[in-house]
Amino acid sequence: QSQTVANSVGDPNILKGFSVDGVVETSLGTFVSAYNGALDVSIRPECIELSIDSEGSYVVQECTFYGHDQVISFQNSKGEVFRARSLPNTIYEAGDKVNIKISEVTTFPSN
């Protein structure tokens, strides 16, 4: 697995992390990894579920509709911007505070 492979199957969010004893901490949470040391953590936009919460830790920057789905750009408190993709069941607007739930990540050694 590599970042090249991850990018070839879509436009994932790639985060840097360092894993100790199979646990890697990133700016989007803590995850289990089969690798130790410096890692890239790939999170596909459709693996990030947003929920509107007035006390949320993230802020929606923009939402782009594609008919069958939508891509939501959101920012953490460090100013890093990430993308989520979901069905248009919930309408997100710039400035909405949200929380996230991540269903799946892929890790691989950093180049």
Residue ranges and their predicted role:
Residues Q1-G10, I14:
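Conserved beta-strand-loop-alpha-helix hinge in the C-terminal portion
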Residues P12-I14, F18-N111:
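Non-catalytic connector elements of ABC transporters
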